[in-house]
């Protein structure tokens, strides 16, 4: 892509971003990101979070999802969050900065969870996008497979999993894998998710 084309594309993205009603609402409310609204929509339909729960947040930065969940689980709840990027502190959130794909980071995350099981694992992870689906989709699928492995390790029976997935090669197989592990599985496309985006959210409840 030439610099001129890239500049035009970036300008269009910025224009779309700042005219987005959810971006504007997030700024007015002092929220960390528009992702807050996506999780709010999912919570309204699926009732994943309750006071006192322990929740794992993968791909947490800048903190929109953790910021939302804190309001749902209260002071007795706990969030263990992880991201490659830094994240400003949130009261009630135990944040680990590191690459989730790294075995040592995964080990450190499991140590923070401890022996007790968690009630919800949520993943908003995504790779750095190149714009080429043949490259981006496999990278994204690798991350969501790791998130599902995390569920196998730490999620309590009856627990829930919400994960951002990009539709493309491997999506149907991944959905089948989740259906084998949970009693109820829904695919959600929140209104606050941009229409042109390939992203959807798989909401799985009732860990078998």
Curated annotation (Swiss-Prot):
GO cellular component assignments: cytoplasm
InterPro entries: RNA_methyltr_RlmE, RNA_MeTrfase_FtsJ_dom, rRNA-MeTfrase_E, rRNA_MeTrfase_gammaproteobac, SAM-dependent_MTases_sf
EC number, as in UniProt: 2.1.1.166
Molecular functions (GO terms): rRNA (uridine-2'-O-)-methyltransferase activity
Pfam families the UniProt entry points to: FtsJ
Family annotation (SUPFAM superfamilies): S-adenosyl-L-methionine-dependent methyltransferases
Subcellular location: Cytoplasm
Binding locations of S-adenosyl-L-methionine: 63, 65, 83, 99, 124
Reactions that this protein is recorded to catalyse: uridine(2552) in 23S rRNA + S-adenosyl-L-methionine = 2'-O-methyluridine(2552) in 23S rRNA + S-adenosyl-L-homocysteine + H(+)
Alphabetic keyword roster: Cytoplasm, Methyltransferase, rRNA processing, S-adenosyl-L-methionine, Transferase
Gene Ontology process terms (BP): RNA methylation
Active site per UniProt: 164
Enzyme class: transferase
Family annotation (HAMAP family): RNA_methyltr_E (MF_01547)
Family: Belongs to the class I-like SAM-binding methyltransferase superfamily. RNA methyltransferase RlmE family.
Protein known as: Ribosomal RNA large subunit methyltransferase E
